[in-house]
Amino acid sequence: MTRTVLLRALTKNKFVASNAPRSISISITSLSRCISTLILAEHESGTIKPQTVSTVVAANSLGESSSISLLLAGSGSSLQEAASQAASCHPSVSEVLVADSDKFEYSLAEPWAKLVDFVRQQGDYSHILASSSSFGKNILPRVAALLDVSPITDVVKILGSDQFIRPIYAGNALCTVRYTGAGPCMLTIRSTSFPVTPITANSESKKATVSQIDLSNFEDDSVSKSRYVGRSTQDTERPDLGSARVVITGGRALKSVENFKMIEKLAEKLGGAVGATRAAVDAGYVPNDLQVGQTGKIVAPELYMAFGVSGAIQHLAGIKDSKVIVAVNKDADAPIFQVADYGLVGDLFEVIPELLEKLPEKK
């Protein structure tokens, strides 16, 4: 039955060739490949986010003949800058699709979901991927609801075009999932499981085609359902928590907002990002966007330092891909020591000041 459906799908569509110039607005056409992947790209201030490139790496595992298209949406010059960067962000990207409209100025889920469905209808994609970030988790389920398919979330390994591995039970077990749906296979990718190999800067040798999507027939009746109110950000020179090479995390043992500033000072000296456990966030020491763990940010830095962190399974699930884990805790039986590469049983109120004294200022 599956083979019959596949053969019908392959013979139903015809190859479409186009000699349209690369710079003009064109309609999207299907190349009718067996595996054709659409990736929802995240960008900010004219720059493609690292988790999008990791998603491209994951898409490469779907099959050797897979074609990969990036979908960018937004408005203004920063969108076009991001599109130009996306065209050379990875050799596997064959096309960059750009939706330039005020409707996509903010990453609201409703218009984005309509856009993905609009692009899918014209492109006939077999797979639709997004990073397991707040962006991807917000948009992809809405697209899946529109298409009446079940998305597969938090994929950490791709075994084939229809078989994937994802964590369950707070990361204590791995589940192999096979997709058998009729619609496109939708995945959110845990970016820390698909590291990006540095690419030598041979910029002009491999660059994807950038196409402006023709939105003249795009109808969006969802604009009135939600509206952009505002965005709050923290002014800091520290790197983003999700992509930082060094992460310094504090737990509830720090006892107060004032004491948590020691973690911030240590992070500044090491050029790292600040993280926190759920207990520290719930206690009000830091905002919840700094939470590390299964229900917060999944991190995979070169160095992860945990102070006063006991090691709940939800927290450990969010740091397990870290290269080196250093733990400081008064409790010698704390679960964090079971996963730490280096552990120190001691009082953080003695250890951190000594570290701050001996570490040089970051240049």
Curated annotation (Swiss-Prot):
Assigned protein family: Belongs to the ETF alpha-subunit/FixB family.
* Pfam families given in the database record: ETF (PF01012), ETF_alpha (PF00766)
For this entry, the transit peptide stretch runs 1-24
Annotated keywords: Electron transport, FAD, Flavoprotein, Mitochondrion, Transit peptide, Transport
- Which InterPro entries is this protein grouped with? DHS-like_NAD/FAD-binding_dom, ETF_a/b_N, ETF_a/FixB, ETF_alpha_N, ETF_asu_C, ETF_asu_C_CS, Rossmann-like_a/b/a_fold
Q: How does it assemble?
A: Heterodimer of an alpha and a beta subunit.
Q: Which PROSITE patterns match?
A: ETF_ALPHA
Q: Cofactor binding mode, per the note?
A: Binds 1 FAD per dimer.
Q: What is this protein called?
A: Electron transfer flavoprotein subunit alpha, mitochondrial
GO cellular component annotations of the record: mitochondrial matrix; mitochondrion; nucleus
Induction (record text): Expressed constitutively. Not induced by dark treatment or sucrose starvation.
Q: What molecular function terms (GO) are annotated for this protein? A: copper ion binding; electron transfer activity; flavin adenine dinucleotide binding
What is the scientific name of the source organism? Answer: Arabidopsis thaliana
The reply to whether NAD figures as a keyword in the UniProt entry is no
Q: What does this protein do?
A: The electron transfer flavoprotein serves as a specific electron acceptor for several dehydrogenases, including five acyl-CoA dehydrogenases, glutaryl-CoA and sarcosine dehydrogenase. It transfers the electrons to the main mitochondrial respiratory chain via ETF-ubiquinone oxidoreductase (ETF dehydrogenase). Involved in leucine catabolism and in phytol degradation.
